[in-house]
């Protein structure tokens, strides 16, 4: 009997033994086509020869050095690379997972306010229908009813405003611009009610990932939100743990929104899953307030700026740049959306297909005309996943798409290296899975 604690405590997962490109292989030799990079992680696929070579080279050089005493060329170079592409952020720190860097963002937001002599600026505002991590801090700002439910009593208080979810919430008599303005006014009002002297930061996923299924904001939304934050001296912190590092066709998803936040968190795709590594980038204003204040970052963890993880992430980023993969992500993304629309056009339960780059969501409804959220909930998501697995297809379904408990979606996040032929196979097989599962 296994000694491993699994997510599903009563069933064993499949034993994975290998992978190559967009394919994963189990112990019985069955191959699975990966439409979702696991959970938007494997952007370069499996067994990439350059990454394998980098492991051998770097592991022979230096495994680990404590960040309290040492820095490394890899950490310096990776930070410079990420900062230089950020459009205005100044410093980066590396941790192991998305929750950790989002928790760090919360701590730095408060440390910054406090060291400026504004310790009352301590309230965090986030959006409903969002996910920012599994620690108690990050879960408290996650507008994800399902993931919060067990731990509700333990969570510190946080405030929430509406998501930017045009498919469901933009009114028929409203333009995208008016919708964005209405949401910015809602945030403005929320801050006024709480008192801007009490609010530290506003958090948002640039493109909402697992909770809603690849939902980008309407054009102009983030510019208006940023203006509200600036007006009230509130930090704007973007969570791109899932959407960042090329997934939308830009290194940072906010490039499409025409803004630069005060902080951004990235994770999953940073080392394409070859290493557990994440990063938080912050502005010079925030860094210098702390540097000239206490001079000490109020957070310490064992694997800060892990040398080997940074070196592998750097090689991953180098491959993405040299192979011009972001352009490919944009092109394949358009193909994916248009092929999905074509192949699912006759299914009335497919309500919306949206996203950016290779970050695409399919939302299910009871009927296209009414947009009534699909009734299937968790059972439908599980059935889709099971059917797909049987057919050798890895998909990432979710439920609670609309208002936290209702509705279903599937998130596509295939590796950046996916060929046209492989993309076509993903769409074809997915269409067959949807048709095979009772609805
Ligand atoms: C947007 C977002 N933020 C934070 C996290 C947490 O990251 P991790 O699971 O690596 O801790 C996730 C994970 O799915 C995420 O999608």
Predicted regions and their residues:
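Conserved N-terminal phosphate-binding loop of PLP-dependent enzymes in the Aspartate aminotransferase
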Residues: 1-439
């Amino acid at each position: 009997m296994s000694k491993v604690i699994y997510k599903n405590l009563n069933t064993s997962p499949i034993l994975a033994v290998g992978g190559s490109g967009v394919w994963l292989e189990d112990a019985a030799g069955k191959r699975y086509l990966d439409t979702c990079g696991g959970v938007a992680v494997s952007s370069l696929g499996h067994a990439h020869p350059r990454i394998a070579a980098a492991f051998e080279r770097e592991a022979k050089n230096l495994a680990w050095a404590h960040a309290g005493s040492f820095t490394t060329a890899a950490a310096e170079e990776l930070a410079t690379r990420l900062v230089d592409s950020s459009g205005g952020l100044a410093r980066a720190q590396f941790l192991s997972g998305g929750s950790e860097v989002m928790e760090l963002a919360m701590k730095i937001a408060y440390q910054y306010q406090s060291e400026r002599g504004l310790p009352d600026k301590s309230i965090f505002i986030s959006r409903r229908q969002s996910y920012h991590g599994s620690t108690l801090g990050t879960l408290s700002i996650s507008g994800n009813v399902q993931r919060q439910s067990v731990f509700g009593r333990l969570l510190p208080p946080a405030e929430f405003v509406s998501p930017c979810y045009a498919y469901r919430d933009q009114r028929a008599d409203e333009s995208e611009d008016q919708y964005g303005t209405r949401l910015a006014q809602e945030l403005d009002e929320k801050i006024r009610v709480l008192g801007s002297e009490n609010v530290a930061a506003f958090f948002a996923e640039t493109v909402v990932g697992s909770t809603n299924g690849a939902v980008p904001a309407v054009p102009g939304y983030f510019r208006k939100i940023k203006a509200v934050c600036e007006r009230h001296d509130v930090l704007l912190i973007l969570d791109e743990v899932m959407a960042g590092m090329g997934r939308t066709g830009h290194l940072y998803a906010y490039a499409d929104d025409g803004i630069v936040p005060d902080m951004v968190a990235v994770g999953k795709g940073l080392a394409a899953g070859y290493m557990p590594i994440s990063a938080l980038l912050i502005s010079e204003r925030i860094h210098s307030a702390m540097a000239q204040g206490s001079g000490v970052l109020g957070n310490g963890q064992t694997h800060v700026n892990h040398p080997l993880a940074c070196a592998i992430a750097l090689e991953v980023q180098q491959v993405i740049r040299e192979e011009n993969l972001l352009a490919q992500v944009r092109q394949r993304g358009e193909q994916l959306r248009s092929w999905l629309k074509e192949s699912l056009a006759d299914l009335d339960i497919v309500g919306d297909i949206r996203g950016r780059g290779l970050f695409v969501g399919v939302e299910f409804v009871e009927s296209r005309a009414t947009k009534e959220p699909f009734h299937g909930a968790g059972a439908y998501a599980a059935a889709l996943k099971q059917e797909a697995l049987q057919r050798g297809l890895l998909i990432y379904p979710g439920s609670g798409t609309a208002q936290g408990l209702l509705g279903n979606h599937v998130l596509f996040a295939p590796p950046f290296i996916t060929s046209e032929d492989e993309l076509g196979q993903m769409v074809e097989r997915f269409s067959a899975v949807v048709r095979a599962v009772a609805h």
